[in-house]
Amino acid sequence: MSTPGDFSLSPFILGGAVDPRSMSQLGNICHADYMSTSTESQERSLNNPNDTHPEIVNVVSTFQLGVKLELRKIVQKARNAEYNPKRFAGAIMRISSPKSTALIFQTGKIVCTGTRSIEESKIASKKYAKIIKKIGYPIHYSNFNVQNIVGSCDVKFQIALRTLVDSYLAFCQYEPEVFPGLVYRMASPKVTLLVFSTGKVVLTGAKDEESLNLAYKNIYPILLANRKEDISNQ
């Protein structure tokens, strides 16, 4: 259902089960981002989590229109919309401001993904509703809910993933032959983190910014204790 390089439609981004086999592209991006980080910024943030924080890279929300939809009619009359039922059960629509993608289902349920804040997601959802209303549907916009907030950050030091998984086995999944990142499932807040040896961290599953930031605050000392240089000197 997703296109190459489009993580916004993957089960990971939508808040589903994390499958490392589907995340190899994300691992490559994380590695490239880390290599572009300067040594000066790495030293500045070390030992001080306040210098770094998760940046929201995607908000996934859902809402209802309260009416059955004819998806072929919608894609015929709307711009930037497509529908291929052999590939995916819903129609896909995109708008540029705020930049986002909507997955539109016959039931009237819509998934909005790709925005960088909850407020942007609300604005985008109402724009999609307005587009469908103009096509001729007597919509009733309701039940806007944030399903998943995805954040990304860089702790600016390398991490010994094997040591980390040995210390926190109950929370970790690590299959380096399949995927270079470690999957850490935090119990409270209920957030899943992808941790890379480069220091890149992706957080998913949060329903609000407070949970996203708290998850990072909780994981930072664990990552610092498993800093690769510190482990090698013991």
Swiss-Prot record:
Pfam families: TBP (PF00352)
Keywords in alphabetical order: DNA-binding, Nucleus, Repeat, Transcription, Transcription regulation
Nucleus keyword on record: yes
The keyword DNA-binding is assigned to this record: yes
Gene Ontology molecular function terms on file: DNA binding; RNA polymerase II general transcription initiation factor activity
Sequence repeats: 52-136, 142-223
SUPFAM superfamilies named among the record's database cross-references: TATA-box binding protein-like
Compartments it resides in: Nucleus
Subunit details: Belongs to the TFIID complex together with the TBP-associated factors (TAFs). Binds DNA as monomer.
Listed PANTHER family: TATA-BOX BINDING PROTEIN
Chain's role: General transcription factor that functions at the core of the DNA-binding multiprotein factor TFIID. Binding of TFIID to the TATA box is the initial transcriptional step of the pre-initiation complex (PIC), playing a role in the activation of eukaryotic genes transcribed by RNA polymerase II.
Name listed for the protein in its UniProt record: TATA-box-binding protein 1
Organism in which the protein naturally occurs: Entamoeba histolytica (strain ATCC 30459 / HM-1:IMSS / ABRM)
Source lineage: Eukaryota, Amoebozoa, Evosea, Archamoebae, Mastigamoebida
Gene responsible for this protein: TBP
